């Protein structure tokens, strides 16, 4: 199947590059623009309507529309505005200086907007809406392991925040507000763990680096377009693609914590490298609640336990009880793999670094002005003041703070990728280096309906509103599960063509045929993802039984196993939610190929300790890849 996928991807690559024509005007974008004009909305209000809309648009036209509208607003409506209080944050200045040649950074002190600013607005809107939804939704079934740790706490009839009540029992040292905050952090962390399938860190040899480098004239890995750990995707892309390494999970979680109102830092350990220089290794996010740093390991997919199952460790407690880290090693009975040791040791706790996430947009003058002028019914937390946050952070012995450059690295990397994509049609070497882009991203960027379904999922659009003809997320993902007949019919089905943004009258016959072939190739990739996202919808909507049916179906369907780790983990979580503990434990322990295997085994261990469950042969079926069709 992997061979087949490669063929499809390179076919798609060739079609996309050969079409070469300017896309037809996005009718949905034009319709919304016309509607806003008729209502005499000002440029800023109209811009935010585009950003907040659940409907997604042609990517290029969306960013052009948003940036041009913002610049028009800045020149006309905001031309007399001043923000004398703005100064470049002192804590971020070193990063601004380091990346001064990036177009994004060159405008830090200007009131003018770039095309890429549209995606930052979209990212903040999505993550703000998503964070509020996650925190507000009880969904107690998903936190069964916490309920068990709270002494088999009975949640029926509870009117308060159920997880906050559970947290108060597990952590009696917290007051009610702190328990609510820790519960919110746990909910968001759990959502990120379930919805961002963990991928392995990119670890290239020197030879591989030279082969992957998109711009051989640039030495910096990110700026040269060389894939690397943590910086390949913006947080909004991590959400859209539903995949990321543990660093990308971490920064996504930390941005959501900021939007909720909690401070966090990324902890890093220090050790000597082969050349004798000190090397920092990223570890885990630490969220501040009640003056303490609570540790959430995005590689494990679990908070660091405080010696007993599920109870969350603080950094202060861990330093007093460093043996807790050794309890995260896997035993020979649990795994015979070589990498059974936990990746942080007790001696590393004495010299930690706290990295403060900073995005270049959040400290820019233009976004400070924009945030202050947003309509009252369209507020967004677009800015940050890292130097003020540093003052708020608890002072702990041995923890030194510094600005984290990963947000700047992502901009540098994506600039290199975007420039390379423009050259791919003419340069075979560049085109071959970008095969990952056309396999994993291009079809999503070009498929508006796919992105609309994802946006509706982030918003929690699961129910059909009476009298509203708009499809919800579940209905859209169903619609995206195209069968072979539907894909073949695209060439003659004008209704489907228009739904997917194909208009014969706007192109030559050759361009039209190439566009049909391109979208047909995309449809075969889209349906692979839609089934998995449909299961995610049902889990978020509390229908774990329905989710199990879909996940079992996905495991039995021939495919390239792109979502294998996520499917198995989500399936285990669903059985855990239904109190089918032995089945859940068996799934966690047997998914040997998952990058999250270590954490899944720790989860299985804790679940077994809390329930006294043992895995039977029937309850722990071997996890096998979906059958191949080649």
Where would I find each of the regions flagged by the language model?
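Secondary-structure boundary elements
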Residues: 50, 64-241, 280, 290, ...
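Hydrophobic/aromatic-rich core segments of domains that either
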Residues: 166-196, 201, 223-230, 236-341, ...
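Solenoid-like repeat scaffolds
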Residues: 516-525, 552-562, 589-597
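"A position-specific structural signal for the A-helix of alpha-solenoid helical repeats
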Residues: 529, 533, 563-566, 570, ...
């Amino acid at each position: 199947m992997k061979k087949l996928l490669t063929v499809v991807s390179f076919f798609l690559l060739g079609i996309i590059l050969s079409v070469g024509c300017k896309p037809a005007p996005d009718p949905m974008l034009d319709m919304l623009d016309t509607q806003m004009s008729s209502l005499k909305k000002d440029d800023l209000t109209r811009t935010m309507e585009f950003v907040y809309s659940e409907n997604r648009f042609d990517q290029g036209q969306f960013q052009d529309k948003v940036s041009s509208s913002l610049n028009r607003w800045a020149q006309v409506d905001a031309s007399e505005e001043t923000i004398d209080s703005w100064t470049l944050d002192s804590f971020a200045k070193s990063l601004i200086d380091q990346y001064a040649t990036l177009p994004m950074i060159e405008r830090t002190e200007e009131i003018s907007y770039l095309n890429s600013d549209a995606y930052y607005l979209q990212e903040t809107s999505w993550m703000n809406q998503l964070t509020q939804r996650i925190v507000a939704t009880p969904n107690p079934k998903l936190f069964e392991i916490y309920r068990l740790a709270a002494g088999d706490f009975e949640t029926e009839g509870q009117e308060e925040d159920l997880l906050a009540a559970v947290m108060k029992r597990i952590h009696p040292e917290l007051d009610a507000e702190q328990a609510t905050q820790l519960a919110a952090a746990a909910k968001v962390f759990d959502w990120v763990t379930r919805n961002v399938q963990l991928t392995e860190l990119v670890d290239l040899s020197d030879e591989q680096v030279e082969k992957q480098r998109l711009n051989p004239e640039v030495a910096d890995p990110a700026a040269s377009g060389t894939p690397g750990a943590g910086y390949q995707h913006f947080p909004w892309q991590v959400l859209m693609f539903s995949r990321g390494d543990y660093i990308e999970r971490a920064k996504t979680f930390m941005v959501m914590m900021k939007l909720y109102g909690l401070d966090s830092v990324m902890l890093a350990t220090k050790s000597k490298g082969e050349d004798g220089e000190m090397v920092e290794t990223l570890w885990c996010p630490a969220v501040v609640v009640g003056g303490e740093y609570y540790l959430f390991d995005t590689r494990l997919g679990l908070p660091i336990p405080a010696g007993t199952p599920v109870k969350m460790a603080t950094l202060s407690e861990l330093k007093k009880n460093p043996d807790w880290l050794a309890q995260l090693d896997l035993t020979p009975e649990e795994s015979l793999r070589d990498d059974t040791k936990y990746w942080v040791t007790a001696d590393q706790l004495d010299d930690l670094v706290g990295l403060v996430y900073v995005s270049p947009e959040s400290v820019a003058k233009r976004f400070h002005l924009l945030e202050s002028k947003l309509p009252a019914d369209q507020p967004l937390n677009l800015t940050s003041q890292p130097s003020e946050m540093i003052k708020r952070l608890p002072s702990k012995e041995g923890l030194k703070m510094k600005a984290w450059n990963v947000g700047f690295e992502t901009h540098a990397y994506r600039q290199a990728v975007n420039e390379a994509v423009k050259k791919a049609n003419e340069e075979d070497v560049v085109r071959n280096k970008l095969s990952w882009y056309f396999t994993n991203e291009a079809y999503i960027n070009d498929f508006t309906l796919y992105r609309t379904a994802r946006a509706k999922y982030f918003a929690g659009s699961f129910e059909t509103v009476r009298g509203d003809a708009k499809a919800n997320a579940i209905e859209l993902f169903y619609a995206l599960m195209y069968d072979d007949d539907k894909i073949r019919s695209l060439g003659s089905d004008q209704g489907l063509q228009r739904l997917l943004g194909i208009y014969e009258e706007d192109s030559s016959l050759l361009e039209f045929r190439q566009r049909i072939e391109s979208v047909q190739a995309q449809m075969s990739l889209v349906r692979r993802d839609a089934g998995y996202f449909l299961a995610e919808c049902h889990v978020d909507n509390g229908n774990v039984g329905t989710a199990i049916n879909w996940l079992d179906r996905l495991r039995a369907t021939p495919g390239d196993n792109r979502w294998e780790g996520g499917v198995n983990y989500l399936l285990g979580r669903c059985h855990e939610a239904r109190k089918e503990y032995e089945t859940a434990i068996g799934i966690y322990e047997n998914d040997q190929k998952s990058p999250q295997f270590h954490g899944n085994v720790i989860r299985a261990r804790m679940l077994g300790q809390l329930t006294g469950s043992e895995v039977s042969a029937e309850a722990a079926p071997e996890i096998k890849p979906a059958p191949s069709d080649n």
